[in-house]
């Protein structure tokens, strides 16, 4: 691997892309540390320390939300905008036609960017009133109060848009998926809380709860097993044999060789996890912002409590959303009819099947089976730590969602780097 890095460093374009990606990540982490003016973040500590949905969102932002920094909103506005635009693309024919145009993806990305700005503005307004109600503002009345409100809301909104820009810059000029890498850096930066979790386990064990001497090693072993499981399942694929017919071009005989169509078990990567997390967090986040009083509003209190991170119904909804998004993304990314038509145009066929509809039907059946296995894999890895946390009564910070995102992004980025090097006849990580 060290030799691979040395080889990569010798390629000027790849070296520049790596340095650019690191520079953007440094800018992002700096933005997560720059405090918003006129806010006393220490007054918000209690709100983020109860293991609620805000604590979870704070973990996804690398602690920027609880510290009221420039990038406090994180990637949530852009993710929610992406969900809305992609769902509308399927539902509205005009947007679907735009997506099919040569520059359709650029137009949809522009629409997503505008939608993300609107969502960021709404979230900024909500967070401002939460900060105000918690007594964390230095000025709340008069001209100073109005100026403070404008500055805080504008800063949060601009920060969210700047995050979107950072992700797009990595996509264009860096290595890997920009959005995923930003989330990756946020999660990794927040893993210092693992030391607090381990210290808490040891303290409880020293206080007489000796079972935690056994629970801690088991937890570490489970984390390693989950990592290995994620790596295996992420790289697993179903290969469909493709046979190309022989044809004569001039005096040369072309084709006749066998190839394969790779269908990855986890085709969608970590995006279903990220999108499901963003969507299911909305009610719980609203409830945390509103601070509903149980005595005054028992119905709404019970409703928002239902979407608490540790609620059984939250787990069920989270699981179903992961399954749904997994199928949704496979459906919009892979078209069996188009694949079958491409094979027929290139004189390729699946042994034992006629070109056309029989081939597309076979690919559809195979995709459905693989997608089900991949969706169950994502759901189990994401939900298992939540269930274990509920059973043990402890908040497991190294959750399946964060672990899956970190491992998945690392593998995707490594694969991108390997592909870049393979095109230049260098031995890559995976070769």
PLM segments and residue spans:
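N-terminal cationic and glycine-rich segments that engage phosphates or anionic surfaces
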Residues: 1-99, 103-431
């Amino acid at each position: 691997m060290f030799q691979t890095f040395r080889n990569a460093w010798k390629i000027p374009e790849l070296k520049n892309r790596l340095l650019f990606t690191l520079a953007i990540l440094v800018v992002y982490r700096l933005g997560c540390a720059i405090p918003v003016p006129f806010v006393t973040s220490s007054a918000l500590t209690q709100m983020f320390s109860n293991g609620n949905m805000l604590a979870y969102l704070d973990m996804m932002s690398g602690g920027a939300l609880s510290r009221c920094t420039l990038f406090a909103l994180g990637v949530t506005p852009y993710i929610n905008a992406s969900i809305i635009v992609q769902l509308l693309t399927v539902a509205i024919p005009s947007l679907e036609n735009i997506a099919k145009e040569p520059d359709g993806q650029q137009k949809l990305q522009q629409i997503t960017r505008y939608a993300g700005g609107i969502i960021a503005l709404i979230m900024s307004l909500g967070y401002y009133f939460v900060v105000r109600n918690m007594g964390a503002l230095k000025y709340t009345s008069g001209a100073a109060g109005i100026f403070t409100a404008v500055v805080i809301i504008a800063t949060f909104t601009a920060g969210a848009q700047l995050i979107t820009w950072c992700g797009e810059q990595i996509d264009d000029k860096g290595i890997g998926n920009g959005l995923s890498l930003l989330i990756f850096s946020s999660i990794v930066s927040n893993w210092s809380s693992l030391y607090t979790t381990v210290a808490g386990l040891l303290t409880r064990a020293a206080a007489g709860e000796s079972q935690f001497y056994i629970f801690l090693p088991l937890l570490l072993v489970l984390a390693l097993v989950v990592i290995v499981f994620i790596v295996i399942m992420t790289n697993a694929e179903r290969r469909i044999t493709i046979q190309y017919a022989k044809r004569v071009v001039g005096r040369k005989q072309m084709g006749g060789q066998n190839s394969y169509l790779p269908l990855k078990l986890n085709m969608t990567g970590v995006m279903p996890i990220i999108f499901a997390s963003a969507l299911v967090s909305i009610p719980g986040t609203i409830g945390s912002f509103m601070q509903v009083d149980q005595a005054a509003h028992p119905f709404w209190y019970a409703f928002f409590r239902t979407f608490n991170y540790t609620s059984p119904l939250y787990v069920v909804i989270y699981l179903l959303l992961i399954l749904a998004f997994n199928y949704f993304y496979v459906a919009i990314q892979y078209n069996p009819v188009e694949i079958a038509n491409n094979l027929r145009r290139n004189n390729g066929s699946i042994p034992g099947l006629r070109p056309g509809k029989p081939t597309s039907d076979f690919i559809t059946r195979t995709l459905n089976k693989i997608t089900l296995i991949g969706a169950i894999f994502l759901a189990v890895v994401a939900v298992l730590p939540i269930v274990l946390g509920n059973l043990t009564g402890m908040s497991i910070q190294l959750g399946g969602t964060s672990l899956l995102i970190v491992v998945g992004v690392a593998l995707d980025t490594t694969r991108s780097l390997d592909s870049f090097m393979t095109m230049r006849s260098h031995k890559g990580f995976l070769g």
